[in-house]
Amino acid sequence: MGFPIPDPYVWDPSFRIFYSIIDDEHKTLFNGIFHLGHDDSADNLAELRRCTGKHFLNEQVLMQDSQYAGYAEHVRAHDGFIHQLDNWHGDVKWAKNWLVNHIKTIDFKYKGKI
């Protein structure tokens, strides 16, 4: 059971982590998946992959710097998403679901801890 997928697929305050850089990057990921859903092009996929890699790195550095206990679990989740992007089969619904549920379950665990 997961969280509802917003329609239209846009970031809203229910996804707020309260770290402005992370919230801004999450907005970018929502936009990237939204655009991929409207044009499943190599360029849109490459841009989503670039933004995702940057965001995951930034988030992981914050976790390492704060010695966040859930770091290893979080990195495994990130690695799984990157693997799916690197082996893309056009499943935008999966990507939408993954991001929504990742933020609201995995990311919400570090609120106030990094």
Curated annotation (Swiss-Prot):
GO molecular function: iron ion binding; oxygen carrier activity
Native organism: Golfingia vulgaris (Marine worm)
Claim: Lipoprotein is one of the keywords in the record: no
Recorded family membership: Belongs to the hemerythrin family.
Binding site for Fe cation 1: H26, H55, E59, D107
Disulfide bonds: none
Record keywords, A-Z: Iron, Metal-binding, Oxygen transport, Transport
InterPro entries in UniProt: Haemerythrin, Haemerythrin_Fe_BS, Hemerythrin, Hemerythrin-like, Hemerythrin-like_sf
Pfam family for this entry, one: Hemerythrin
Protein name (record): Hemerythrin subunit 2
Chain's role: Hemerythrin is a respiratory protein in blood cells of certain marine worms. The oxygen-binding site in each chain contains two iron atoms.
Residues at which Fe cation 2 binds: E59, H74, H78, H102, D107
PROSITE patterns: HEMERYTHRINS
